């Protein structure tokens, strides 16, 4: 597809995928995109040491724009991360130290980098940090040059902070209230520095984005645009991107590639085709064909595997995907020979329940400690009934004690009760 053709239809394509929540002056933006490549930006605040799944949709949107010939700017909020965005947050955020925020900025910048192309000629991506323009700004400049253009009357009517202003118990500090000015100035600054004409972000960012559009017009007399992506919801009403263990992170040290892959495999049928539109680069036709195929196959749908494979490859590369599939396969068929030491480390990290034990423990004790069995008596019966495997091998002797050959890589023993209940023993 030709780039210009892709560009003018880009908003329509994003809408077809369900990726547009709100857009300012859609007609003018479509015209602007039709005229040729633009620069656009999305901001990522360092509120933790890793991005999570909620960041993936706007990040992939930057990539979609770049693939259509536009220039993406990934802004990491070294300054805004020190202040904290109050948008739709019920309580004040905890302020983090400058050292912590700086460390997180570096991590997040490294995390964003693989998604974009920083060396492709005209539309190479740019990495920016708003600490560069706020770090040395003095308070008088801030109040005179930025504050003067903001009406408090309008600010207190923004949906994002309304709930905080109407509550006596939590309220909102001046620090967080001023966040809107900082993000607004980011847009004006990037417009001047890089000619940025569009900001994209999550739908909770609408108030901050429109402030930036307004400020850019007042400071530079330029028309710029905003587009928000929807908050991802699940058909059952539960929160997307959370598991019982908390958020699903993009950092493999926080959420292992295996756990990440399993998260997508467990997507409900009611959500999977929508998620393929949000999180992959498959065409709408390919997704519809897959849905049709799944409907008529009479077998379990293939869509979850396609989704898990595509997103895991995007985030963790071929190597991470291969490990996730290898571990999945080994747990399914009970043959652990293919697993590497690093694979066991992933399982210990957050793949299956894990306990640490001293050498010399017997099988009954391990089953009780791992909560695979409630008591030694019950464990004895279960072992005798042939329902327990050690590293994939059945073990029916209740008096069994572990030997060195049970400790894979000198450290790991995988217990299974029945078909699906696992525990990994890590020997001290």
UniProtKB/Swiss-Prot annotation:
Binding site for ATP: 242
Subcellular localization(s) per the UniProt record: Cytoplasm
Record keyword Protein biosynthesis present: yes
Top-level division of the source organism's lineage: Bacteria
The enzyme's E.C. designation: 6.1.1.1
Family: Belongs to the class-I aminoacyl-tRNA synthetase family. TyrS type 1 subfamily.
UniProt catalytic activity: tRNA(Tyr) + L-tyrosine + ATP = L-tyrosyl-tRNA(Tyr) + AMP + diphosphate + H(+)
NCBIfam families xrefs: tyrS
Name recorded for this polypeptide: Tyrosine--tRNA ligase
Keyword annotations from UniProtKB, A to Z: Aminoacyl-tRNA synthetase, ATP-binding, Cytoplasm, Ligase, Nucleotide-binding, Protein biosynthesis, RNA-binding
Presence of the UniProt keyword Cell inner membrane in the record: no
Pfam families in alphabetical order: SYY_C-terminal, tRNA-synt_1b
GO cellular component terms listed in the entry, alphabetical order: cytosol
Lineage, broadest ranks: Bacteria, Pseudomonadati, Pseudomonadota, Gammaproteobacteria, Enterobacterales
Domain S4 RNA-binding span(s) in chain numbering: 361-418
GO molecular function: ATP binding; RNA binding; tyrosine-tRNA ligase activity
Motif annotated as 'HIGH' region, chain positions: 46-55
Motif ('KMSKS' region): 239-243
Description of how the protein assembles with itself and partners: Homodimer.
Major localisation: cytoplasm
Any one GO BP annotation for this protein: tyrosyl-tRNA aminoacylation
Chain sites annotated for binding L-tyrosine: 41, 179, 183
């Amino acid at each position: 597809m030709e780039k210009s053709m892709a560009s003018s239809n880009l908003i329509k394509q994003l809408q077809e995928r369900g990726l547009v929540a709100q857009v300012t002056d859609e007609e003018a933006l479509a015209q602007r995109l039709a005229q040729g490549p633009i620069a656009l930006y999305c901001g990522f605040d360092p509120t933790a040491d890793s991005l999570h799944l909620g960041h993936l949709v706007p990040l992939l949107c930057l990539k979609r724009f770049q693939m259509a010939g536009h220039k993406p700017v990934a802004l990491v909020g070294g300054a805004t991360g020190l202040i904290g965005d109050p948008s739709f947050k019920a309580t004040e955020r905890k302020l983090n130290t400058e050292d912590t925020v700086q460390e997180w900025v570096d991590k997040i910048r490294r995390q964003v980098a693989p998604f974009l192309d920083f060396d492709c000629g005209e539309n190479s991506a740019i990495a920016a940090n708003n600490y560069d323009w706020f770090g040395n700004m003095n308070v008088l400049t801030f109040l005179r040059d930025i504050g003067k253009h903001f009406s408090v009357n309008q600010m207190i009517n923004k949906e994002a902070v309304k709930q905080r202003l109407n509550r006596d118990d939590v309220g909102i500090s001046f620090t967080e209230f001023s966040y809107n000015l900082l993000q607004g100035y980011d847009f004006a600054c990037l417009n001047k520095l890089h000619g940025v004409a569009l900001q994209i972000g999550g739908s909770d960012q609408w108030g901050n984005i429109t402030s930036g559009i307004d400020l850019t017009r007042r400071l530079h007399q330029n028309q710029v645009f905003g587009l928000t992506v929807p908050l991802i919801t699940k058909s059952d009403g539960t929160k997307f991107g959370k598991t019982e263990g908390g958020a699903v992170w993009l950092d493999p040290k926080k959420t292992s590639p295996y756990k990440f892959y399993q998260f997508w495999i467990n997507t409900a049928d009611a959500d999977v085709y929508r998620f393929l539109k949000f999180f992959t680069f498959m065409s709408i036709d390919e997704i519809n064909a897959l849905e049709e195929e799944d409907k008529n196959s009479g077998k379990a749908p293939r869509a979850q595997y396609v989704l898990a494979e595509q997103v895991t490859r995007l985030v963790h590369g071929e190597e991470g995907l291969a490990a996730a599939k290898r571990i999945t396969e080994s747990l399914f068929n009970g043959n652990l020979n293919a697993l590497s030491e690093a694979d066991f480390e992933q399982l210990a990290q957050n793949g299956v329940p894990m306990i640490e034990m001293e050498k010399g423990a017997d099988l009954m004790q391990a089953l009780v400690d791992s909560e695979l069995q409630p008591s030694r008596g019950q464990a004895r019966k279960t072992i005798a009934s042939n329902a327990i495997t050690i590293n994939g091998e059945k073990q029916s002797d209740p008096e069994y004690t572990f030997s060195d050959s049970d400790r894979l890589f000198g450290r790991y023993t995988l217990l299974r009760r029945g078909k699906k209940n696992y525990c990994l023993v890590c020997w001290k």
